[in-house]
């Protein structure tokens, strides 16, 4: 059965003030309200089978923001003439079909789409499968120093004729299809990593002795990984007992956390968990609404333990300095 591949591009409006909404008890910031959708259905050779294009009339950010107007060339009149957003989004998802696999240039549009579907009381569970075509492109054409990854820069680099404007949703989607025809799209889709594979690669880079990798999905609260016992409680890789995390956690990049956890049963012994075990987490929110938490434990080597002790001491110093500064400021206001 042929795949139902949908390339799509969104243009969205933003407000002059943030818009906060409640998603199953958790406050989230609205990324933007969709004002234009362009999409094409393609086969696995990127041949265009069908197209879809629509302008939408927003309900929340009704005034066209000046930067959006400059980038897209749209006017307030274009927004006012658009199809009502609920009706238009429903029509788009029906055109896509329940088995659609979405693909976009980057990973910005799916979170925006899902937020808009939710705020329009439509089913935000779709799409369940989507692809970042930049990853597939980079697999065949590794990025060189100074090379941009905007759609326009890649179209130029691939020698594709520029016969349509950019920042028009349907036009950008057709350019994306042009780029895909320059690739081995079938192979790229087949090799595309799952969320679990991506999280494992990020959390468990070589070299390292990693154990008990797990992924916990579908959480709306980012802090759940620290409060849910089944996520925060890891098992000792030697005896299977519950590990006890250190009070100090070190942040790794934008969405990773590490600590050294102790196993009461193994502490002080000569086994590989005797000096503690690193407990590591990676947080991801690919769809803009739900968090996934990846966890593993790592058997430390001597260099890793020394690095941990040094960074832990530095973190404690920073915490103490912040506390002293806050106390001094409080005294000054008294």
Regions found by a protein language model. Give the residues of each.
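Short aromatic/hydrophobic-glycine micro-motifs
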Residues: 74, 122, 160, 241-242, ...
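Metal-dependent phosphoesterase core characteristic of DEDDh/y 3'-5' exonuclease domains
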Residues: 31-37, 41-72, 93-219, 283-287
């Amino acid at each position: 059965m042929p795949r139902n591949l949908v390339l799509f591009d969104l243009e969205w409006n933003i407000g002059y003030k943030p818009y906060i909404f409640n998603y199953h008890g958790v406050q989230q910031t609205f990324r933007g309200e969709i004002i234009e959708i362009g999409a094409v259905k393609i086969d696995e050779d990127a041949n265009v089978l069908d197209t879809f294009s629509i302008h939408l009339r927003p309900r929340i950010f009704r005034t066209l923001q000046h930067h959006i107007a400059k980038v897209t060339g749209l006017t307030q009149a274009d927004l006012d003439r658009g199809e009502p957003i609920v009706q238009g989004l429903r029509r788009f998802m029906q055109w896509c079909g329940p088995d659609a696999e979405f693909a976009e240039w980057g990973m910005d549009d799916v979170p925006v789409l899902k937020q808009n579907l939710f705020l329009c009381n439509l089913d935000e569970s779709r799409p369940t499968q989507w692809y970042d075509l930049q990853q597939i492109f980079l697999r065949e054409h590794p990025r060189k120093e100074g090379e941009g990854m905007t759609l326009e820069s890649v179209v130029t680099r691939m020698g594709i004729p520029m016969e349509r404007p950019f920042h028009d949703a349907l036009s950008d989607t057709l350019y994306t299809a042009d780029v895909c025809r320059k690739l081995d799209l079938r192979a790229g889709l087949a090799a595309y990593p799952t969320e679990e594979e991506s999280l494992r690669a990020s959390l468990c880079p070589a070299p390292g002795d990693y154990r008990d990798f797990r992924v916990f999905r579908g959480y709306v609260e980012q802090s759940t990984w620290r409060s849910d016992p089944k996520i925060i409680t890891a098992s000792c890789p030697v005896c299977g007992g519950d590990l006890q995390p250190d009070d100090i956690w070190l942040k790794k990049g934008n969405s990773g956390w590490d600590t050294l956890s102790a196993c009461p049963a193994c502490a002080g012994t000569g086994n590989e968990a005797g000096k503690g075990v690193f407990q590591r987490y990676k947080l991801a929110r690919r769809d803009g609404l739900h968090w996934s938490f990846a966890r593993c434990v790592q058997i430390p080597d001597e260099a890793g333990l020394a690095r941990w002790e040094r960074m832990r001491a530095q973190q404690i110093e920073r915490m103490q300095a912040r506390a002293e500064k806050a106390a001094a400021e409080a005294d000054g206001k008294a």
